[in-house]
């Protein structure tokens, strides 16, 4: 059971809002996550991102692999 850090989509049509979650690689995009780690709102100006650095570092230490988009968010907003 590999764990990935990925985005789940919320919000209405054409107004996306995403949660950053830890979920197994077999879990559907909007399936039940293991833990919520933050959120990403691309519709605001500037873009609103809130990440729980402690939880993300804990999951990365356990071997969780972030998706490309989540990796970019971590790199940009946790640096």
Swiss-Prot record:
BP GO annotations: translation
Xref: SUPFAM superfamilies: Ribosomal protein S16
Alphabetized GO MF terms: structural constituent of ribosome
Family of the protein in this entry: Belongs to the bacterial ribosomal protein bS16 family.
UniProt cross-references to HAMAP family, sorted A to Z: Ribosomal_bS16
NCBIfam families reported for this sequence: S16
Protein name as catalogued: Small ribosomal subunit protein bS16
Source organism (scientific name): Desulfovibrio desulfuricans (strain ATCC 27774 / DSM 6949 / MB)
Gene field: rpsP
């Amino acid at each position: 059971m590999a764990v990935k850090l990925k985005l789940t989509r919320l919000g209405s049509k054409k107004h996306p809002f995403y949660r950053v979650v830890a979920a197994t690689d077999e879990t559907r995009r909007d399936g039940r996550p293991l833990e919520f780690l933050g959120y990403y709102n691309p519709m605001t100006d500037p873009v609103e991102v809130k990440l729980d650095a402690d939880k993300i570092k804990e999951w990365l230490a356990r071997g969780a692999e972030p998706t490309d988009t989540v990796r970019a968010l971590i790199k940009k907003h946790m640096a």
